[in-house]
Amino acid sequence: MISFSSFYQQIADSNLQHWLEELPAILGQWQREHKHGNLPKWEKVLNKLHYPAPDRIDFTTRVEVGSGDQLSKGQQEKLKNLLKLFCPWRKGPFDLHGIHIDTEWRSDWKWERVQPHISPLKNRTVLDVGCGSGYHMWRMLGDGAKRVVGIDPSPLFLCQFEAVKRLAGNDHPVHLLPLGIEQLPPLDAFDTVFSMGVLYHRRSPIDHLLQLRDQLRTGGELVLETLVVDGDENTVLVPGERYGKMNNVWFLPSAKALEAWLKKADFVDVRCVDIDVTSLAEQRSTEWMPNESLVDYLDPNDVSLTVEGYPAPKRATFIAVKNQPNKDLV
């Protein structure tokens, strides 16, 4: 069974220690709820990942663990077959002992858009909300973060992350907790909080912004990336049953409306640093994610629209700072 004991040990003498009052019980409940289904099968695969310590690691320009020269052809093929059991791989790419995991998303492109605008991560404690399989967490570590905690409730994402971590070495201060942000006790401790690709999935986006704020220390930085539409500060798209075939998209604000939401949630120094239309090269089907992808979600006659007729995905990145506590916001 996947253990979180090393995480508890690492935060025992840190500014995250108050989580120890509640998180062990919360994660214990998660483990009990997932003792059936796919998780035990994936854990058996994880237990087969016994490979030599990597001869090289690069988290600064990519996520690379081990060179292609370290394993025999047979060992590489066995490793590839094991990693294939964790398909679909959505966020990446990863290079593991010479095996290139070409994921659905080019998450490295998103990082290249976001990273130049954020405060340096050196020695910072970072929370990544909706972290997926953890690609950006490794890049944050590569940029010098002291500790990175990611949260995402998906058991598959947890196992994909654990596969990379076991190959890289378990001593890295990066941890994925299979939880949603609503399950986290407020901490007011993180230097930087990322929420990328999450806000439009929330029924109450303002509550999500307040939950993000509650994890930040005063003066800490929020990095928020989400879908937006064109329009003024009063423009918000509320899709019907589906948006891009997704049935869990609730609100798509304009960039100006999102700026107003952030200020309403008591963030200051709010600025939009990037707006980018998602390209068919950035999100697509691959060997490692052979299911439908962006091209299938767009109008075949007009890629500026989704199949439902809404504007095609456009993503904005905002940077904001947590203000002094406001007792009127609860």
From Swiss-Prot:
Catalyzed reactions per annotation: carboxy-S-adenosyl-L-methionine + 5-hydroxyuridine(34) in tRNA = 5-carboxymethoxyuridine(34) in tRNA + S-adenosyl-L-homocysteine + H(+)
Entry's EC annotation: 2.5.1.-
UniProt keyword 4Fe-4S, yes or no: no
Protein name per the record: tRNA U34 carboxymethyltransferase
Subunit structure comment from the entry: Homotetramer.
The UniProt record lists the keyword Repeat: no
GO molecular function: methyltransferase activity; transferase activity, transferring alkyl or aryl (other than methyl) groups
HAMAP family, A to Z: tRNA_carboxymethyltr_CmoB
Classification via PANTHER family: METHYLTRANSFERASE (PTHR43464), TRNA U34 CARBOXYMETHYLTRANSFERASE (PTHR43464:SF95)
Domain of life according to the entry: Bacteria
Residue numbers binding carboxy-S-adenosyl-L-methionine: K91, W105, K110, G130, D152, P153, S154, I181, E182, M196, Y200, R315
Chain's role: Catalyzes carboxymethyl transfer from carboxy-S-adenosyl-L-methionine (Cx-SAM) to 5-hydroxyuridine (ho5U) to form 5-carboxymethoxyuridine (cmo5U) at position 34 in tRNAs.
UniProt entry keywords in alphabetical sequence: Transferase, tRNA processing
Disulphide bridges: none
Family as reported in the entry's similarity comment: Belongs to the class I-like SAM-binding methyltransferase superfamily. CmoB family.
UniProt-listed GO biological process terms: tRNA wobble uridine modification
